[in-house]
Amino acid sequence: MNARTFLWIAAALFLGGALAACGKIEAITQPAAQSGNANFRTYVAMGTSITAGWESGGLVEHHQTKSYAYLFAHQAGASAFTIPSVSADGVPPLLRILSLNPLFITNAGRTPGAFTNLGQPTSYHNMAVPYSTVFDAVDSIYYYTAIPPNPPNPERILMFENIARHRGTILQQVLGQGPTFISIEYGSNEVLGAASSGSGTPLLSPPLFDAIYDTLMANIARFAPQANLALVTVPDVTTIPFFTTFPPYTVSLTTGAPVSLVGPDGPLAPADLVLLRAADSLAIGTGIPVGGYNYVNPAAPGNGRPLLDSQVLNALESAEIQSAVAAENTTIRDAATTAGAALVDLNGLLREASTTGLHYQGHTYATDFVTGGLFSLDGVHPTDLAHGFIANLMIDAVNAKYGAHIPHVNLSESATATSSRLQPARGSKPMPWIQGADRLCPIVMPGDVIAAR
């Protein structure tokens, strides 16, 4: 597997900062959970890489055991919560920071891990599969590898083969455990694939998502009528660091006036999004207008050549993705109402994080890449700390719906991620690299460093 490597910028922002801590969940002295009208004895989770605990480009046990689903099971007092455990250094090997000045992030030199409990005779309680969509949950034809994309994605196939293990569909394996509580988190990959490709991948139509989601819910109602439910909304993926890190404009070296980057259709508009995968192009001056300041690599003058369509999400494409997210969330909200399920508003939590930030013990955590504390090094997936916030969001929703009294996760266990004192002033965005230009350095990033999970 090719090493995923990139150099990053503005190292001064990171000096003195602490990185997110990882580790096993320790016992917390808290009041015992009271289940109210719910039953958490056999909790099974369905979902995508978010629920699986994918972080910084891969799966590894010390992050899988910090996923919101794992934390919820711990807090709610589930009898067990098995996961498809992955040894260090992860599958694929996780990204890491090797240098702060300049910031150097890579998985080079790391050893691929392995799935360590494939022989478990029962299905896992965490049946979330990275790359999966709601269709994959009910698909009975390609259930062990998912519908092969064109060209095939070996990581996608690897995840299905090692988590589903040819034991039946995801839904069949969930229902076969006699679940008393199920959480469902689908919809992100239906839109993330289109968004992360610059909208080069077609969106799943809202009516089709609605029909498949309804099929999933109908089967659960029929074959697991005893199960209480928590349904998770779809976050607006256009607000995550993968889409918000690079501004669509720079400044003129001669006048200091703002000038637009060059996209496939000409100058970018203020609402256009430059994807993180454009980093390698920007580093050699592509996308930077002639005479414009290269905020990624000042040593490489702008050459005026346009960025590729796959590196830019224009305002119309962003609006289409946001519309699809809204439609999916309408489906999920309606399903929660019909089923009497708890609704976990992950979309609302991300909206709060990307505007005012999330607050804990005097610190503010935000969605800024690396420095914000909420997103891992792949720019897409939550950190351990963010999973703690999500777990508490789920706990609040379940407590309110079922009259339960589940104690919150102690966020202090994960709150060593970059804190508010290291944030650039919010008013300085979206051009944090213009200041202190002598501290900037080149970026080199393979175009496939991040794909929809």
Language-model region placement:
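Sec-dependent bacterial lipoprotein signal peptides
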Residues: 1-20
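Conserved catalytic region of serine esterases and O-acyltransferases that act on ester linkages
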Residues: 24, 92-142, 244, 249-453
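Extracytoplasmic/secreted proteins, especially bacterial periplasmic and envelope-associated proteins
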Residues: 45, 63, 67, 71, ...
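Conserved SGNH/GDSL esterase-like catalytic core that processes O-acyl groups on lipids
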Residues: 59-215, 238, 243, 411-452
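A structural motif corresponding to the C-terminal end of an alpha-helix
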Residues: 77, 176-177, 212-230, 324-345
